[in-house]
Each structure stands twice: as structure tokens, then as C-alpha cells.
């Protein structure tokens, strides 16, 4: 659901993104730049629980229908994608991650012309969704689709560390076992 003021919502949304936290796959001895990273919005439903590793609480928070005061659909669907991916609910995660990409793209497409200044931020949100879906695709042995998602994410948000890190992890995964982290921007 859109806020009446994207001006106030977007900066808080960006500020609500937090630091990386290791979650699953691989040994702790591996170098950080070779770990996949999932990105959650900590100021969205379930976000704080995801970053702290409380996946049961995150799943419960994300199972409730949004209220009028809830964050936009792309924030919720993105966090649902992360939650289902880290809990290895692959079929549900595919649906959630596809929805996260569609919701972020829809938000970008419906951005009013007087808010064109926010276009770069909207690109970042689409890149987050694509990057998360790429991690899911890699985890379910679809490296080709993961690479396509990451390529598109890099085109939209070339300076995003989460995209660069996942590109590095995907490249590294062809040589050795990579692992997944959950992070926020």
C-alpha cells in the first residue's frame, strides 16, 4: 500500500536497512566477499526478526494481512521472500520472490512524474528484489537464472554492495561452495 507521502516513507525505508548477519550455508572460515547475501527491510514487517535470526517470529509477522498503516507491498513481499528462502520453503519462496520483484517494478512504474527524483531509489528496491530472487535461484540450483537476475540488478543499481557481493559469490560458487548471509542495505 502506498503512503500518501513517498517523501517521508522512502528515506525511512532506506534508513531501515541494516548490516549483514551470517545465516546459513558453508563454513564460517570462508571469506565474506564470497557469501551470498539476502537483503531485508528492517523497518518492514518481520525485518528486525529476520536480521536477528528469529525466523519463526518473522514468518508469523509476515503471515498477517497488511493493514492500512502497513508498509507497501514490495517491502512485505521482499521480507517474505527472505523469510521463506532462509527457512528453505522453496516453492513458497519462489512465489514470494517473484511477487517481490513484481511489486517493486510496479512501484517504480507507477511513480508519479513529480517524484522523478526518487527513480534511483526505486531502481535500488527492484535490485534488492532481484538480488534476493537470485540467491533463491542459486540455492535451488538454477545458476543461469540467478546470473540473469544479478545482471539486471547490477544494471539498475551498479553501486549496490549487496548486488556486487552476490555477483562475486555466484562467480566464486562455480569454483567452491559459497554461503548465504542475510543483510540490509
Q: What is each PLM-predicted segment?
A:
Residues 37-68:
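Alpha-helical segment of the N-proximal tetratricopeptide repeat
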Residues 35-36, 136, 147-185:
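Terminal, low-structured helical/coil segments at or just beyond the last alpha-helical repeat
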Residues 33, 64-73, 103-123:
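Flexible helix-coil transition and linker loops at the boundaries of alpha-helical arrays
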Amino acid at each position: 500500500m502506498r503512503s500518501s507521502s513517498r517523501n517521508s516513507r522512502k528515506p525511512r525505508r532506506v534508513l531501515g536497512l541494516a548490516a549483514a548477519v551470517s545465516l546459513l550455508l558453508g563454513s564460517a572460515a570462508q571469506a565474506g566477499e564470497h557469501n551470498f547475501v539476502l537483503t531485508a527491510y528492517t523497518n518492514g514487517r518481520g525485518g528486525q526478526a529476520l536480521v536477528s535470526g528469529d525466523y519463526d517470529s518473522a514468518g508469523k509477522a509476515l503471515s498477517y494481512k497488511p493493514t492500512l498503516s502497513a508498509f507497501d507491498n514490495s517491502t512485505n513481499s521482499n521480507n517474505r521472500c527472505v523469510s521463506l528462502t532462509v527457512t528453505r520453503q522453496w516453492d513458497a519462496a519462489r512465489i514470494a520472490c517473484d511477487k517481490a520483484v513484481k511489486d517493486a517494478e510496479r512501484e517504480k512504474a507507477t511513480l508519479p512524474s513529480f517524484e522523478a527524483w526518487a527513480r534511483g531509489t526505486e531502481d535500488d528496491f527492484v535490485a534488492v528484489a532481484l538480488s534476493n530472487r537470485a540467491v533463491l535461484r542459486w540455492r535451488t540450483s538454477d545458476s543461469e537464472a540467478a546470473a540473469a537476475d544479478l545482471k539486471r540488478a547490477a544494471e539498475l543499481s551498479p553501486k549496490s554492495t549487496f548486488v556486487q557481493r552476490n555477483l562475486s559469490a555466484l562467480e566464486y560458487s562455480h569454483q567452491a561452495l559459497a554461503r548465504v548471509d542475510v543483510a540490509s542495505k
